[in-house]
Amino acid sequence: MGRMHSAGKGISSSAIPYSRNAPSWFKLSSDEVVEQVIKYARKGLTPSQIGVILRDAHGVSQAKIVTGNKVLRILKSNGLAPELPEDLYFLIKKAVAVRKHLERNRKDKDSKFRLILIESRIHRLARYYRTVSVLPPNWKYESATASALVA
């Protein structure tokens, strides 16, 4: 998929393993993987960080293959899911950082333009999450209260 606000084509991507079952050398049970996911979530890690740790330290290529559920679904069933979706959270965090930079550097026109692009992405993503009922229908991004969302 191409980039939203630049000319990049985005041709590089990772290949998902074709096999839909756990490899023969994999010894962990699905309950042990779920326990690991819950343990890392309680430490405050995001779902993607949990997936990276499971891949690198425990040899779990995909949690869905081993457990039957994705990491976020495991977190939701245990009441540990983040209140904001991860991609929206990090966009808001980036917008807060750019806005803080602009308070110190008022003449930085490029950062002002980039902030507009970031906030456009936030509004677009929030509209999507409202339509699929991940966010409540009256949820709205406001730059004044954004720092409270990511704190």
Swiss-Prot record:
Keywords: Ribonucleoprotein, Ribosomal protein. GO terms for cellular component: cytosolic small ribosomal subunit; nucleolus. SMART domains: Ribosomal_S13_N (SM01386), Ribosomal_S15 (SM01387). SUPFAM superfamilies: S15/NS1 RNA-binding domain. PROSITE patterns: RIBOSOMAL_S15. GO terms for biological process: translation. Pfam families: Ribosomal_S13_N, Ribosomal_S15. InterPro entries: Ribosomal_uS15, Ribosomal_uS15_arc_euk, Ribosomal_uS15_N, uS15_NS1_RNA-bd_sf. One of its GO terms (molecular function) is small ribosomal subunit rRNA binding. The keyword Electron transport does not apply. Belongs to the universal ribosomal protein uS15 family. This is Small ribosomal subunit protein uS15. It comes from Candida maltosa. The lineage of its organism: Eukaryota, Fungi, Dikarya, Ascomycota, Saccharomycotina.
